[in-house]
Amino acid sequence: MSSFKVAVLLIAVYGASQGTSIPGGWTRQDPTEARFLELAHFATSSQTEGREFYDTVVTVKEVETQVVAGMNYKLTIEISPSVCKIGEVQYSAEQCVPKDAQQKSTCVAVIYHVPWQNQKSVTSYRCE
């Protein structure tokens, strides 16, 4: 193989390994950052329809972000029913601990956030 082809191949492999993203595409983030746990609790606590108890976040497994006119956050999370009854208490990440940490579901939430307009909303939330 010519040295030119080898150089092009090495540059392509290096670029791919650096996690370069497509403009407007989703970019992986570190799921251990505290801000993502806060967003996960925000999304999960908003899901009350048809439930007697709030669900709570057990762990944030994956996070992807997308720059739009604001920011989209796609969170893959594990949730579990909490000890907090809807209508009796306000959701709190500290107080609404799992009833049974073994009973988990995996969910994907998309949160749209426009900080300069003080706007944050859950645009999608689905569980397996």
UniProtKB/Swiss-Prot annotation:
It is found in: Secreted. Disulfide bonds join 84-96, 107-127. SUPFAM superfamilies: Cystatin/monellin. GO terms for cellular component: cytoplasm; extracellular space; vesicle. GO terms for molecular function: cysteine-type endopeptidase inhibitor activity. Keywords: Disulfide bond, Protease inhibitor, Secreted, Signal, Thiol protease inhibitor. Widely expressed. Detected in salivary glands (at protein level), gut (at protein level), ovaries, and Malpighian tubules. The keyword Secreted applies. Residues 1-19 form the signal peptide. Residues 29-116 form the Cystatin domain. InterPro entries: Cystatin_dom, Cystatin_sf, Prot_inh_cystat_CS. Induction: Down-regulated by a blood meal. Inhibitor of cysteine proteinases with broad specificity for mammalian cathepsins, including endopeptidases (cathepsins L and S) and exopeptidases (cathepsins B, C and H). Also inhibits endogenous cathepsin B-like and cathepsin C-like proteinases. Does not inhibit human legumain. May mimic specific host-derived cystatin(s) to interfere with its/their function in controlling cathepsin-mediated proteolysis. Belongs to the cystatin family. This is Cystatin-2. It comes from Ornithodoros moubata (Soft tick).
